[in-house]
């Protein structure tokens, strides 16, 4: 009896190098402009070529401006990184979706929507949120620049074998409770180091009921729980999403692929090293209050008191977060005012996210105290949203409608918070300075962010009108 992780691992195992270290084969290598330049330079210096350019795909996302596609207006360092990626890809025969390509977008949005992500694959990228692709039953994880070079040169990677963790979420979610709330509740329960050394498999009826886009949200934040990767077993929802995409198998190959993919599920009776259980009906809309994704409470909660900490380390963490976030213990989450809203990122920038946010703000107006932006995850998402009129709903409400990119998720482009700004964000990290020096980030789902933009503070989306 084997877990899904064990099946994928064994199918890609090249050999054991020494005690605890293994060489595994990589099926798909995704690259972007920030973590690849030094890797390509290393290849040149060593006189090596890219081993499998056809298995490598690139896009520009981290540094891309969502305001303009005029590279002359970009930050000089960002412009150099984007130009370098294009040059490196052209020289090595790698397909690149640059900032002028209509299908450009965040790497973890465009790869699945193009059918590049399949069950049973190994997928790596020089980006920690590569775990997103685990929603398809692929073993996907982030790697460092030296490892990017190794994969480019050999199509293999040296790894230690992870332990297995089962996270079960059974039952039915309450209305307006989303995948973002599930993963924040999980991180709140086990902590940001709770899954260190593990690959998580998300299981249970509540997980099986999720759409593919919602599953991607769950797996996206596996890294925030400390995990190496996150997996969800492939099923008909998975197959229906992949079918007909640009790079998905066609005809007879499709039937053979689905037959193979159905193998990548955990066998009944297989043992996990650890199991964590949550009940879906107990999960409420969640809001982070601090500077770690684990510092999270329900919308009906309050900012915690350091005196209630379980240990001295947690106490210091709470005290530090309270100071940085300029909050007081006992303060109601619903009383926290915000002045910025960001709907986007590889966590929540897909069409379902934008539909939910647009439905929330339709016919309403953004608070005069708030600047709110919506950043589609890809050119395809943007075009689909515009075909459905979502852009008009957002702009009529007072939101800014932008071009695709990582945007305000991280302070590496021209979408940044100013010191003292407080942002309701659908992204995945709320560390100090993550969205800009001195900026304060509260992680929420798309509908919660949209409602906060209208009211100027957090509200319970379940009974908000």
Swiss-Prot record:
Residues binding [4Fe-4S] cluster: 346, 406, 409
Catalyzed reaction equations: (2R,3S)-3-isopropylmalate = (2S)-2-isopropylmalate
Keyword Iron-sulfur: yes
Note accompanying the cofactor annotation: Binds 1 [4Fe-4S] cluster per subunit.
UniProt keyword terms in alphabetical order: 4Fe-4S, Amino-acid biosynthesis, Branched-chain amino acid biosynthesis, Iron, Iron-sulfur, Leucine biosynthesis, Lyase, Metal-binding
Domain of life (superkingdom): Bacteria
Assembly and interaction partners: Heterodimer of LeuC and LeuD.
Protein name per UniProt: 3-isopropylmalate dehydratase large subunit
Species in which this protein is naturally found: Leptospira interrogans serogroup Icterohaemorrhagiae serovar Lai (strain 56601)
Lineage of origin: Bacteria, Pseudomonadati, Spirochaetota, Spirochaetia, Leptospirales
């Amino acid at each position: 009896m084997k877990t899904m992780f064990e099946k994928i691992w064994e199918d890609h195992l090249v050999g054991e190098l020494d005690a605890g270290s293994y060489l595994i084969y990589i099926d798909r290598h995704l690259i972007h402009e920030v973590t690849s330049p030094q890797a390509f330079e290393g290849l040149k210096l060593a006189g090596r070529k890219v081993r499998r350019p056809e298995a490598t795909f690139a896009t520009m996302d981290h540094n891309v401006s969502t305001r303009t596609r005029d590279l002359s207006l970009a930050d000089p360092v960002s412009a150099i990184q984007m130009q370098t990626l294009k040059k490196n890809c052209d020289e090595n025969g790698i397909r690149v979706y640059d900032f002028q390509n209509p299908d450009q977008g965040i790497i973890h949005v465009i790869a699945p929507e193009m059918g590049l992500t399949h069950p049973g694959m190994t997928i790596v990228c020089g980006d920690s949120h590569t775990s997103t692709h685990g929603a398809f039953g692929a073993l996907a994880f982030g790697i460092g620049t030296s490892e990017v070079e190794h994969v480019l040169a050999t199509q293999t990677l040296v790894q230690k074998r992870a332990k297995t963790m089962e996270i079960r979420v059974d039952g039915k979610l309450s209305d307006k409770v989303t995948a973002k709330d599930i993963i924040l509740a999980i991180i709140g329960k086990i902590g940001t180091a709770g899954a260190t050394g593990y690959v998580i498999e998300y299981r249970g009826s509540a997980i099986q009921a999720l759409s593919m886009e919602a599953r991607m949200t769950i797996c996206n934040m596996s890294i925030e729980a400390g995990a190496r990767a996150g997996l969800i077993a492939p099923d008909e929802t998975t197959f229906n999403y992949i079918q007909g995409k640009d790079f998905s198998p066609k005809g007879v190959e499709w039937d053979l692929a689905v037959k193979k993919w159905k193998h990548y599920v955990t066998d009944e009776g297989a043992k996990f090293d650890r199991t964590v259980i949550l009940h879906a009906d107990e999960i409420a809309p969640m809001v982070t209050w601090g500077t770690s994704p684990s510092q999270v409470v329900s919308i009906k909660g309050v900012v915690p008191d350091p005196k209630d900490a379980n240990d001295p380390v947690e106490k210091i963490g709470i005290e530090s977060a309270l100071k940085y976030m300029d909050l007081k213990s006992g303060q109601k989450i619903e009383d926290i005012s915000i002045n910025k809203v960001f709907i986007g990122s590889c966590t929540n920038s897909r069409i379902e996210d934008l539909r939910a946010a647009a439905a929330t703000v339709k016919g309403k107006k953004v608070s005069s105290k708030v600047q709110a932006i919506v950043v589609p995850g890809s050119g395809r998402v943007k075009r689909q949203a515009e075909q459905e009129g979502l852009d008009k709903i957002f702009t009529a409400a007072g939101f800014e409608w932008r071009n695709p990119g990582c945007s305000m998720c991280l302070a590496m482009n021209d979408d940044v918070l100013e010191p003292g700004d407080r942002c309701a964000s659908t992204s995945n990290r709320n560390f100090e300075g993550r969205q800009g020096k001195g900026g304060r980030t509260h992680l929420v789902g798309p509908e919660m962010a949209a409602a906060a933009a209208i009211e100027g503070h957090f509200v319970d989306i379940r009974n908000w009108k």
